[in-house]
């Protein structure tokens, strides 16, 4: 099987989109992953530029900052996060994309503000709402665990699967990012294998968040496992300079 490849443009923020798209296309990628800040884009221009370059939008990397918290104890804060996710679903539909990434808790939130049972309940309730809205506009969602140094909430694929299994959605799956997984999974390939057909999106980066081959992650068994489970989503490069805040470049 042949993989479909995409590139996350978060490091290109501030650069003219035509340059971003041309670069991604010239390097042979099939698709591009946009940054989850709708104000950065003119959707009609994005569609034209992508068509001119022969690429599509694979996905949107949603930006879960402190005010976008699906498990916050304040209902108004949770609603703000839901509204943001709906904006991203609309954006994805406008640009003809496939998958939006959903993380229940924002980057940098390192301790709970409510009992674990409550937070789990809010995560399930609110991801369900986001997923239903996404289905209505014709796009998919992918639940992403982050490593323990970026969030306390869910750090491994099996924890994301626990949430997914309690949802009533046909357009939802799991997102596996090899950078995060290298920190919190015992074995990346095994985690992908156990997730199986529930895996619908990936981010690829080496152990230092640089390009594969620049760190110490062994990608051969990882890619073989993706083939073995017939992964049909996009293999998306997310290469970010080392920083305590992964959104610092936006």
Predicted regions, residues:
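Histidine-acidic metal/acid-base catalytic patches
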Residues: 1-25, 40, 96, 154-176, ...
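N-terminal pre-domain/capping segments
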Residues: 1-94, 169, 197, 248
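Short, flexible active-site-adjacent loop segments at beta-strand->alpha-helix junctions, enriched
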Residues: 11, 38, 61-66, 98, ...
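Residue-level detector of anion-binding/catalytic polar loops
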Residues: 30-31, 56, 98, 140, ...
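Conserved beta-strand positions in the central sheet of alpha/beta enzyme cores
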Residues: 33, 59-61, 101, 142, ...
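Short amphipathic alpha-helices and their capping/turn segments at secondary-structure boundaries
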Residues: 41-54, 82-96, 124-132, 187-194, ...
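Active-site acidic/histidine proton-transfer and metal-coordination neighborhood
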Residues: 52, 71, 75-173
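A short acidic, helix-capping loop that chelates divalent metal ions and anchors anionic groups
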Residues: 66-72, 108-114, 149-150, 183-184, ...
């Amino acid at each position: 099987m042949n993989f479909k490849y995409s590139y996350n443009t978060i490091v290109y923020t501030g650069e003219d989109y035509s340059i971003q798209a041309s670069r991604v296309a010239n390097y042979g990628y099939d698709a591009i992953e946009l940054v989850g800040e709708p104000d950065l884009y003119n959707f009609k221009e994005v569609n034209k530029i992508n068509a001119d370059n022969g690429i599509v939008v694979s996905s949107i990397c949603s930006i879960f900052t402190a005010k976008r918290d699906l498990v916050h104890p304040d209902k108004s804060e949770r609603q703000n996060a839901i509204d943001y996710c709906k904006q991203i679903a609309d954006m994805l539909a406008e640009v003809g994309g496939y998958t939006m990434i959903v993380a229940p808790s924002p980057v940098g939130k390192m301790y709970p503000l409510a009992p674990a049972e409550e937070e789990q309940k809010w995560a399930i309730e609110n991801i369900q709402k986001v997923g239903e809205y996404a289905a209505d506009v014709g796009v998919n969602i992918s639940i992403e665990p982050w490593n323990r140094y970026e969030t306390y909430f869910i750090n491994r694929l099996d924890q994301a699967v626990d949430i997914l299994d309690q949802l009533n959605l046909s357009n939802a799956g799991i997102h596996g990012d090899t950078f995060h997984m290298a920190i919190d999974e015992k074995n990346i390939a095994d985690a992908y294998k156990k997730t199986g057909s529930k895996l619908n999106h990936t981010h690829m980066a080496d152990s230092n968040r640089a390009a594969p081959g620049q760190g110490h992650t062994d990608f051969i068994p990882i890619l073989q496992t993706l083939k073995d489970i017939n992964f049909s989503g996009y293999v998306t490069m997310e290469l970010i300079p080392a920083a305590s805040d992964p959104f610092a470049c936006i």
